């Protein structure tokens, strides 16, 4: 289940760093395959959880991130993965919708859209597609982290990441005045 968080963040970093090196088709394929793996992991985790017969919450991972025991006895901030009936269902929802968005984006983000809004400094439109898939992978990572959060602090971190990645996706066509205006709302 840890892999469901690792795959999208690795895709974000890889596609973000390889923006000028990958073709549109390779970036789209890599992003879709990565989310396809998350989809399989999400469905497997949810089905295994529900098939177990016990709907008790499970902490798959619980690690101390910040330890304040010197200040107050037993006070720490933990990061982890928490699976209960709601988060198991949301795993299915988030991974399914993210996978479908990746598939749809392969056809929608055609050259006409990218050339129309390509930034002059980039020289051509091919760099935009990798950036889009990197932002989409960050959004998926953020949503999955939000769904699997173990505490309110972790939930807040991922909620903010959802906001940042939404801003980046809404303002993707940063040379279009309408997209710039929409991303400021």
Predicted region positions:
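Structural signature of hydrophobic alpha-helical transmembrane segments
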Residues: 1-7, 85-95, 152-165
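Residue-level marker of motif borders
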Residues: 3, 79-80, 146, 155
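Hydrophobic residues within membrane-embedded alpha-helical segments of Major Facilitator Superfamily
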Residues: 4, 11, 34-37, 41, ...
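N-terminal signal-anchor/start-transfer transmembrane helix
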Residues: 5-20
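Juxtamembrane interface elements at the cytosolic ends of transmembrane helices
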Residues: 10, 14, 100-117, 161-173
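Transmembrane helix-loop-helix hairpins at membrane boundaries of multipass inner-membrane proteins
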Residues: 18-134
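Alpha-helical multi-pass transmembrane bundles of energy-transducing inner-membrane proteins
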Residues: 24, 132-185
């Amino acid at each position: 289940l840890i892999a469901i968080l690792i795959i999208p963040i690795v895709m974000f970093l890889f596609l973000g760093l390889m923006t000028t090196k990958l073709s549109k088709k390779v970036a789209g394929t890599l992003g879709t395959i990565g989310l396809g793996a998350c989809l399989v992991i999400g469905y497997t985790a949810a089905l295994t959880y529900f098939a177990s017969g016990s709907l008790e919450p499970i902490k798959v991972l619980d690690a101390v991130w910040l330890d304040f025991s010197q200040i107050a006895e037993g006070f720490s901030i933990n990061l982890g993965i928490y699976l209960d009936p709601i988060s198991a269902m949301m795993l299915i929802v988030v991974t399914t919708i993210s996978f479908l968005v990746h598939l749809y984006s392969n056809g929608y983000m055609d050259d006409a859209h990218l050339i129309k809004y390509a930034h002059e400094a980039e020289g051509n439109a091919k760099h935009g597609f990798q950036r889009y898939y990197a932002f989409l992978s960050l959004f998926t990572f953020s949503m999955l982290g939000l769904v699997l959060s173990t505490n309110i602090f972790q939930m807040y971190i991922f909620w903010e990441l959802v906001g940042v990645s939404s801003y980046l996706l809404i303002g993707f066509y940063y040379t279009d005045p309408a997209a710039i205006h929409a991303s400021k709302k």
